[in-house]
Amino acid sequence: MGFLAVIDYDMGNLHSACKGLEKAGIQPKITDSPQDIAEAEAIVLPGVGSFDPAVQHLRSRHLEEPIKQAIAAGKPFLGICLGLQILFEGSEEGKEPGLGIIKGKVRRFQSEPNLTIPHMGWNQLQFTQSNLSLWQGLTPDPYVYFVHSYYVDPVDPNVNAAVVTHGSQTVTAAIARDNLMAVQFHPEKSSDNGLQILSNFVTMVKQNS
């Protein structure tokens, strides 16, 4: 079996994501090398922070094309938090174009009375692709851990894999299209449910090898 690459582009602490993957049964390789991404059997793109620095850091490391090629080649791919948002065409938070792998935009939560932004803490997922391999073994409407002020708004509603409701706003919490999966919440901070999701991804990686 080859290796799973966790992309390091200076956007947040990769330690907890890697620890979660190790618990799920795989030893990830942290890398910012285009060649590693080309050779990897599967890819995880984590990240916390702001949209513009994230895409700038990816492009300055020449990682945009290897990421696009890996997804096009059918390699299992998991984006986490900011790693979901930069797959889209752009963000209300910044001016830089995103990777544009998924059509749509990243939007900010609308202000509401008594609504806290960022959306932070435990909240329930509602599955929109309930048969997704990533969700295997989870109870319906599981609680996972969120920290975000922006959410993705895909043009094609069929890429939605789960939604979450914050105040009166129900927004995308996860997307899935073929081998490409990405989540707004933090599986590595989501206790048993998060570990189950990472384990499901690792199972897909092993089945794909």
Where are these regions (language model features)?
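Extreme N-terminal starter segment of soluble prokaryotic enzymes
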Residues: 1-5
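Pocket-forming structural segment of enzyme catalytic cores
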Residues: 90-167
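An anion/phosphate-binding loop that grips the pyrophosphate of nucleotide cofactors and donors
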Residues: 40
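Short, surface-exposed beta-strand/loop micro-motifs that present aromatic residues
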Residues: 169-176
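Cysteine-nucleophile active-site neighborhood
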Residues: 49-120
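Acyltransferase
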Residues: 183-209
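Beta-strand-turn-beta hairpins that frame and shape the catalytic cleft
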Residues: 141, 176-180
